[in-house]
């Protein structure tokens, strides 16, 4: 229903317009207060790169963060990552991730980024506190913040927006009548716009999510996902249909697709109940970091990597590395 409202297919979005106007008024006032100097943002002693969205829902932001961290690491840059830690609840903040940190403490995306990149990762509701925790423990040269485009309390040097190239901005309205956190005109002020799928427009960087080999959660064995049989697909991400479409494109045709809420807590019994005798469970890598501790032999995940095309990605990386002292 939400997808139909935000796309404009359902006329119910009109009923929510008063709330959207209020949301837009408040969010605009907050941003203006920082632009006018009425509120002060905290500036880190190292450059800060924000990777965020203009819309709610999954746009492929986390794969972009991983891509950016890995590309900078390949250039010899010491990178730290901060996040709000949605879906997690730590005993105390800021929380600096370790190999023992769980998704229940830090959230699924920070744990995934930490496991994939090995970069220092810290979470806190106040992102400045997370930055300070990393700087106190690690000699990093740059900070990447996973989400937080609208978190103006943290000053930033570069802003990158990730856009779903198929859904784009839906009906164009602020939450809750539409998907927008800020209006599309905000794109004029960011340093780069990366478009996940669909067709990129002038000045935007095209990106595709390229699936790798399926990985068994228990053994680490790898195989082409199309070789798996009797698949039940599970996706607890911002836009589950994208994952299900990826499986179809890979030649894996799920018998059943189970969409879950983004950052949803997964109980062992609930996940186990999804799979019947002789079936194979295939999930996203983000779900896998929550399920690995209680995984069964027939559970697999499909990792995806961000592939950015054209000359713009190299120019963006050069611009970012030029800020590193």
From Swiss-Prot:
Nucleus recorded as keyword: no
Associated pathway: Glycolipid biosynthesis; lipid IV(A) biosynthesis; lipid IV(A) from (3R)-3-hydroxytetradecanoyl-[acyl-carrier-protein] and UDP-N-acetyl-alpha-D-glucosamine: step 6/6
Annotated InterPro entries: LpxK, P-loop_NTPase
Binding-site positions, ATP: 55-62
Enzyme Commission number: 2.7.1.130
Alphabetized PANTHER family for the sequence: TETRAACYLDISACCHARIDE 4'-KINASE, TETRAACYLDISACCHARIDE 4'-KINASE, MITOCHONDRIAL-RELATED
Function: Transfers the gamma-phosphate of ATP to the 4'-position of a tetraacyldisaccharide 1-phosphate intermediate (termed DS-1-P) to form tetraacyldisaccharide 1,4'-bis-phosphate (lipid IVA).
Designated name of the protein: Tetraacyldisaccharide 4'-kinase
Originating species: Salmonella agona (strain SL483)
Phylogenetic placement of the source organism: Bacteria, Pseudomonadati, Pseudomonadota, Gammaproteobacteria, Enterobacterales
Gene: lpxK
């Amino acid at each position: 229903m939400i997808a139909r409202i935000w796309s404009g297919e359902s006329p119910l979005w009109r009923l929510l317009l008063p709330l959207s106007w209020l949301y837009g008024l408040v969010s605009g006032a907050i941003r203006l207060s920082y632009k006018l100097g009425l509120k002060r943002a905290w500036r880190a002693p190292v450059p800060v790169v924000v990777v965020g969205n203009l819309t709610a829902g999954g746009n492929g932001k986390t794969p972009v963060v991983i891509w950016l961290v890995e590309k900078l690491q390949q250039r010899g840059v010491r990178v730290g990552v901060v996040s709000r830690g949605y879906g997690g609840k730590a005993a105390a903040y800021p929380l600096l991730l370790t190999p023992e940190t769980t998704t229940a403490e830090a959230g699924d995306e920070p744990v995934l980024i930490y496991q994939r990149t090995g970069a220092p990762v810290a979470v806190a509701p106040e992102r400045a506190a997370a930055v300070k925790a990393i700087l106190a423990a690690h000699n990093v040269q740059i900070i990447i913040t996973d989400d937080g485009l609208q978190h103006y309390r943290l000053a930033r040097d570069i802003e990158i927006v990730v856009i779903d190239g198929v859904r784009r901005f839906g009906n164009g309205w602020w939450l809750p009548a539409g998907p927008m956190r800020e209006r599309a005109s905000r794109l004029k002020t960011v340093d780069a716009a990366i478009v996940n799928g669909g067709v990129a427009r002038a000045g935007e960087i095209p990106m595709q999510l390229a699936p790798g080999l399926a990985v068994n959660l228990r053994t680490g064995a790898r195989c082409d996902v199309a070789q798996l049989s009797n698949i039940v697909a599970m996706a607890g991400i911002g836009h589950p249909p994208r994952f299900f479409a990826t499986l179809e494109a890979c030649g894996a045709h799920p018998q059943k697709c189970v969409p879950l809420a983004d950052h949803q807590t997964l109980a062992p019994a609930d996940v186990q109940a999804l799979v019947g005798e002789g079936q194979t469970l295939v999930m996203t890598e983000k779900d896998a970091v929550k399920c690995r501790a209680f995984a069964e032999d027939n559970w697999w995940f499909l990792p995806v990597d961000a592939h950015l095309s054209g000359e713009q990605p190299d120019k963006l990386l050069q611009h970012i590395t030029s800020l590193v002292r």
